[in-house]
Amino acid sequence: MITKDEVEHVGWLARIEIGAAEAEDYAVKLSSVLDYFGQLDEVDTEGVEPTYHVADIMNVFREDVVKPSLDQKDVLANTAEEKDGYIKAPRII
C-alpha cells in the first residue's frame, strides 16, 4: 500500500506540486495498480523459458561497403559558409 506521504515525497523529488487531496487520490490509485501487478506473483511460470527480447533478432547489421563519395568542392558548394576547406557551423556555446 502506498501512503499519501510517499506520493508527496515522489512529487517533491519530481518537482511536481501535489495537493493533499490529490496525494490521497494518487495513493489509492497507485496502490490498486501495484496490487494488480502483484497478481503476476501468483502465475505459474514453471517450465516457461524467460523472454529477454520480444523478437529473437540479435544485432542485425549490414555489411560495410566502401563507395565513392562526393568531391570536397561539391560538398562545400552546398553549404552557406566554409573556412579552410571545411563546413563552418554556428557556435553553440
Swiss-Prot record:
Family matches, as InterPro entries: Asp/Glu-ADT_sf_sub_c (IPR036113), GatC (IPR003837)
Any one GO molecular-function label of the UniProt entry: ATP binding
Reaction(s) this enzyme catalyzes, per UniProt: L-glutamyl-tRNA(Gln) + L-glutamine + ATP + H2O = L-glutaminyl-tRNA(Gln) + L-glutamate + ADP + phosphate + H(+); L-aspartyl-tRNA(Asn) + L-glutamine + ATP + H2O = L-asparaginyl-tRNA(Asn) + L-glutamate + ADP + phosphate + 2 H(+)
Membrane in keyword set: no
UniProt feature coiled coil, ranges: none
Family: Belongs to the GatC family.
Protein name per the record: Aspartyl/glutamyl-tRNA(Asn/Gln) amidotransferase subunit C
Lineage: Archaea, Methanobacteriati, Methanobacteriota, Stenosarchaea group, Methanomicrobia
